């Protein structure tokens, strides 16, 4: 209120969905990615999680690969470039939904692929990692395709290209501290990092 009263610009922050599905609301709240509640993003955090009169500290995510644009807004387009390096399949769907069920997929594989695909690319994994590693993000994006038969065609190129792009973007190396999994609002499992390493070998 004081900033606006003094004629300054309001504090800039990203937001979009208000449903915890886009990841654009990412920020530190009292030193924790997305705040003190587990399994939710900033936009889903309720003020009742804090006591009346509490001082709340908000900060942008910090990583060399996520430069600050203004105030709480960071540039997370490095994730987009990693996706562009291999986050696709080349099967021609041509809008023919009749073919959707022609490739049988085991339920366990489909469920794991779906779980990996729930990654919203918010960057909490990078922001909380002492190395600023994007390994959890990349492993989720690699695994969502690697677990399905449609993703097998580009499997080798996908993992090589996405890991290479991750390195080019300046993300750190994974040292298996597990902080990324703990702070991930979608609970992406460290098992996907193991899957990525298997695909990379």
Locations of the language-model features?
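A generic, well-ordered mixed alpha/beta core segment in the N-terminal half of proteins
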Residues: 24-78
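A basic, amphipathic helix-loop patch mediating RNA/tRNA/ribosome contacts
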Residues: 1-30
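Ferredoxin-type iron-sulfur electron-transfer modules in oxidoreductases and energy-metabolism complexes
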Residues: 1-9, 59-201
């Amino acid at each position: 209120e004081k900033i606006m009263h003094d004629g300054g610009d309001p504090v800039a922050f990203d937001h979009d969905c208000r449903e915890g599905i886009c990841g654009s609301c990412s920020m530190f709240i009292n030193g924790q990615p997305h705040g003190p509640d587990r399994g939710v993003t900033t936009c889903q955090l309720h003020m009742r999680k804090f006591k009346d009169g509490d001082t709340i500290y908000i900060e942008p995510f910090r990583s060399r690969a996520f430069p600050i644009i203004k105030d709480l807004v960071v540039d997370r387009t490095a994730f987009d470039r990693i996706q562009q390096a291999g986050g696709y399949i080349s099967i021609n769907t041509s809008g023919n939904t009749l073919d959707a069920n022609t490739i049988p997929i085991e339920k366990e594989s489909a469920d794991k692929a779906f779980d990996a695909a729930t990654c919203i690319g918010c960057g909490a994994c990078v922001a909380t990692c002492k190395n600023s590693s994007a390994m959890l993000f990349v492993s989720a994006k690699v695994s969502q395709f690697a677990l399905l038969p449609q993703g097998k065609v580009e499997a080798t190129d996908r993992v090589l290209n996405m890991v290479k792009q991750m390195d080019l973007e300046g993300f750190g190396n994974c040292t298996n501290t597990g902080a990324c999994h703990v702070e991930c609002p979608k609970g992406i499992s460290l098992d996907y990092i193991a899957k990525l390493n298997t695909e990379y070998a």
